[in-house]
């Protein structure tokens, strides 16, 4: 059975899982859905209401970090994502999953969904089933409002999330201050992959930015944020990790 990855195309948690599978040499089929419809694909595959979900012959893997663990067990990554001699990888991944991912999603989506309506429609319909794309177009501006409401994407939330992003980036800046190549030393681990992928909405490495039509298509306020975050040590690190390992 070919594993099947259920995703929202531009989700950074889905990008994390996609990256791990591809780097791990796992052949898989990706089933992409628009927001609001992704839960049907997730539940229909035996997962919960969120994506990514990986469907395998061994069962259903419901979280992005658990997908990395599955790749360690069943794939062929050049180096293990969770090496047994690097216990700090676990704590870093947990921090990025809990604190960074929700914050960058809120900030990135806040600005992306306020872009030109034609751009927003293109973002929400790219690579999804035709019937979902038609439904998105029928819903028009209603769907972005539903997304903003469901994820609590508002001015106050963005302010809190911006503070959270700055705190996580400061932690990463400090770890990198000694000149290390990766967050835990010399080898690439789940910590590096998780940080780089979940920083994606505010750093926009070219590989990830294609999901948004390319960095040149981003709304101006988001471009300003991306430029500022790329100028930090942590932001430059995320870009380098993408360039080297993606």
Where are the model-predicted features located?
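GST-like domain detector, emphasizing the conserved glutathione-binding G-site
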Residues: 1-133, 245
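Hydrophobic/basic alpha-helical segments enriched in Actinobacteria
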Residues: 27-28, 35, 52, 140, ...
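Short acidic (Asp/Glu) and glycine-rich catalytic loops that position anionic groups and cofactors
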Residues: 46-50, 147-149, 174, 217-218
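Short runs of predominantly hydrophobic/aromatic residues within well-ordered alpha helices
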Residues: 64, 89-92, 101, 190-191, ...
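A non-catalytic, amphipathic alpha-helix used as a structural packing/dimerization or gating element
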Residues: 88-91, 95, 160-167, 171, ...
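GST-like fold's C-terminal all-alpha helical module
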Residues: 100-213
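Short His-centered aromatic/hydrophobic patch
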Residues: 197-245
């Amino acid at each position: 059975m070919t594993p099947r990855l259920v995703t929202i195309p531009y989700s950074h948690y889905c990008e994390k899982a996609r990256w791990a599978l591809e780097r791990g040499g796992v052949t898989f089929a990706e089933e992409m859905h628009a927001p609001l419809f992704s839960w049907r694909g997730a539940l229909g595959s035996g997962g919960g209401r969120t994506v990514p979900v990986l469907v395998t012959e061994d069962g259903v893997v419901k979280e992005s970090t658990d997908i990395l663990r599955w790749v360690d067990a069943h794939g062929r990554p050049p180096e293990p994502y969770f090496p047994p001699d690097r216990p700090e990888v676990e704590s870093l991944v947990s921090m990025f999953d809990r604190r960074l991912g929700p914050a960058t999603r809120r900030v990135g989506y806040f600005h992306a969904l306020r872009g030109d309506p034609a751009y927003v429609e293109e973002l929400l319909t790219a690579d999804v089933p035709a019937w979902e794309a038609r439904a998105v177009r029928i819903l028009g501006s209603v769907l972005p409002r539903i997304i903003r409401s469901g994820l609590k994407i508002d001015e106050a939330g963005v302010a809190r999330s911006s503070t959270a992003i700055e705190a996580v980036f400061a932690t990463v800046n400090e770890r990198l201050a000694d000149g290390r190549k990766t967050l835990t030393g010399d080898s690439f681990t789940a910590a590096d992959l998780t940080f780089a992928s979940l920083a994606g909405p505010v750093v926009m490495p070219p590989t990830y930015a294609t999901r948004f039509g390319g960095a040149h298509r981003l709304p101006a306020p988001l471009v300003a944020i991306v430029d500022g975050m790329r100028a930090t040590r942590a932001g430059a690190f995320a870009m380098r990790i993408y360039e080297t390992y993606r």
